[in-house]
């Protein structure tokens, strides 16, 4: 099951480590998902923000939104929808970063950053509620590029994959 959490349980709350967020939400593993902004001095998710069926940031959807439906399906909704539209469609969580790596089983490449190697965090869906999480860092390793991630997700049979916030967050 894929679940989400806000930093310390609040939108724009104090910064919280991933391990603390996992522990306080009864999780087993955790990763950072969405890009965030420190404009208020506290981390707030950028763009559309639905967490556990509650709408926090009601922005229009864009190409960079990943949605998780109540039935466990992960997808990127059409551009230009509002949060109320996603809630009505059964969306329980959204994430903002991107790009989409695989959609309907097909690679969604290339992009400007396709060939660059960075620390990465990404999620793939084999089928609803059957996910693959991918996290790399660059301690003694150059990281992954988008093609590498697509190939890894395809090897697990993912029909959808999405690049989450990586870099220092990974």
Predicted regions and their residues:
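Domain-core and long-helix interface of multi-subunit machines
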Residues: 94-98, 102-159
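Short, solvent-exposed aromatic-acidic interface loops
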Residues: 7-10, 78-85, 136-140
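Extracytoplasmic
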Residues: 24-26, 61-63, 96, 118-120
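Solvent-exposed loop/turn segments at secondary-structure junctions
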Residues: 35-39, 83, 119, 138-141, ...
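Active-site-adjacent helix-turn-beta-strand microarchitecture at beta-sheet edges
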Residues: 36-113
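Structural recognition of the beta-strand scaffold that forms the well-ordered cores
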Residues: 28-32, 65-67, 75-76, 124, ...
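Zymogen propeptides
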Residues: 1-59
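Short, solvent-exposed coil/turn segments at beta-strand boundaries
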Residues: 1, 25-26, 68-73, 128-129
